[in-house]
């Protein structure tokens, strides 16, 4: 490529925000050129390995927040509701994850944040899972948390905590009004302070600008998230963003490539909405990303695991772990 981007970045010459935005918006630069540069970086740090992740929706539909993308929002009248599931169901999910060569098992709860009782419930269950499946990484996604809860999660064996920034600081109030951008950043910082690996990502396709997308990538670089899930909006009828169009597959690929160029050494995961937004180009996204969710998401379906395994094999890649 005319800019030798990969060589520059691997030599610690980081992109500036202005330069990244210019690259992202320059229509004379082919998306596949950017992907080729991203692939050189991805291969340098991760080879041809692909990390697999699986979600369990452990508590659904009980939420006070008004997130405009979410089918579990307080504003949604028709939604699946259930309280925190029993430990046996969470443990059964861990068994399925292990049998399917999943490296990270994500336990997700709806709501603004967990009660202390819910945290204790999760901690006891995670402890038991770690005894049975010591090699399985556990990611918790429970909402806004405090120091005491983070300490308990760490002691129980939680390896990673997911709390997405979701969008840029500028656009945040268009997405949700019941908590602040600073609330989200604070939760990530609490996890880092308690030596739990921070996982934080975005949702693209909610009406944000190109500048917002680049701002998101730099914000995640600034908070030093170890893992960055990139979701693409899967519009849900009845939500604020339910009437928006899907992003084009090529726009999605360009976004993923830019996130790799801006966060070169981080785990970048293709997450929710990949099937309906990337469509037939899902495999190409792994030229920049090195991680995917397999199976279903929280309230939307994924594709069969066998298709993901075949996609990885067809690329000449291999499952990490």
From Swiss-Prot:
Looking up SMART domains in the UniProt record yields:
BATS, Elp3
An example Gene Ontology biological process: biotin biosynthetic process
Domain (Radical SAM core): residue spans on this chain:
45-271
The UniProt entry, under InterPro entries, shows:
Aldolase_TIM, BATS_dom, Biotin_synth/BioAB, Biotin_synthase, Elp3/MiaA/NifB-like_rSAM, rSAM
Keywords assigned by UniProt, alphabetized: 2Fe-2S, 4Fe-4S, Biotin biosynthesis, Iron, Iron-sulfur, Metal-binding, S-adenosyl-L-methionine, Transferase
Q: Where does [2Fe-2S] cluster bind?
A: 106, 139, 199, 269
EC number, as in UniProt? 2.8.1.6
- One GO molecular-function annotation for this sequence? biotin synthase activity
Which EC class is this protein assigned?
A: transferase
**Gene3D superfamilies to which the protein is assigned, alphabetical:** Aldolase class I (3.20.20.70)
Q: In which pathway does it act?
A: Cofactor biosynthesis; biotin biosynthesis; biotin from 7,8-diaminononanoate: step 2/2
What functional role does this protein have? Catalyzes the conversion of dethiobiotin (DTB) to biotin by the insertion of a sulfur atom into dethiobiotin via a radical-based mechanism.
Family of the protein in this entry: Belongs to the radical SAM superfamily. Biotin synthase family.
Question: This protein is called what?
Answer: Biotin synthase
Q: Which organism is it from?
A: Staphylococcus haemolyticus (strain JCSC1435)
Source organism lineage?
Bacteria, Bacillati, Bacillota, Bacilli, Bacillales
The gene designation is: bioB
């Amino acid at each position: 490529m005319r800019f030798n981007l990969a060589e520059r970045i691997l030599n610690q010459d980081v992109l500036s925000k202005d330069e990244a935005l210019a690259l992202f918006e320059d229509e004379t630069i082919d998306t596949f050129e950017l992907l080729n540069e991203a692939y050189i970086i991805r291969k340098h740090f991760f080879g041809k390995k692909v990390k697999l992740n699986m979600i369990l929706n452990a508590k659904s539909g009980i939420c006070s927040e008004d997130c405009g993308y979410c089918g579990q929002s307080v504003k949604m009248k028709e939604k699946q509701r259930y309280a925190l599931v029993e430990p046996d169901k969470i443990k059964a999910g861990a068994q399925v994850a292990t049998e399917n060569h999943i490296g990270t098992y994500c336990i997700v709860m709806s709501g603004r944040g967990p009660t202390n009782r819910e945290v204790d419930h999760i901690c006891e269950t995670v402890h038991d899972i770690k005894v049975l499946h010591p090699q399985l990484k556990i990611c918790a996604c429970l909402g806004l948390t405090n120091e005491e809860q983070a300490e308990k999660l760490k002691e129980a064996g939680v390896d990673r905590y997911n709390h997405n920034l979701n969008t840029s600081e500028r656009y945040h109030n268009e997405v949700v009004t019941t908590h602040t951008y600073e609330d989200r950043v604070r939760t990530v910082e609490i996890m880092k302070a308690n030596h739990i690996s921070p996982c934080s990502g975005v949702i693209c396709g909610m009406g944000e600008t190109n500048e917002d997308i680049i701002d998101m990538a730099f914000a995640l670089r600034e908070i030093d998230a170890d893992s960055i899930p990139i979701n693409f909006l899967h519009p849900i009828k009845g939500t604020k963003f339910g009437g928006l169009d899907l992003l084009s597959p090529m726009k999605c690929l360009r976004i993923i490539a830019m996130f790799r160029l801006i966060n070169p050494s981080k785990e970048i995961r293709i997450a929710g909405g990949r099937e309906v937004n990337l469509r037939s180009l899902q495999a190409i996204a792994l030229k920049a990303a090195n991680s995917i969710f397999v199976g279903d998401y929280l309230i939307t379906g994924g594709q069969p695991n066998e298709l993901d395994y075949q996609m990885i094999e067809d690329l000449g890649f291999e499952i990490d772990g």
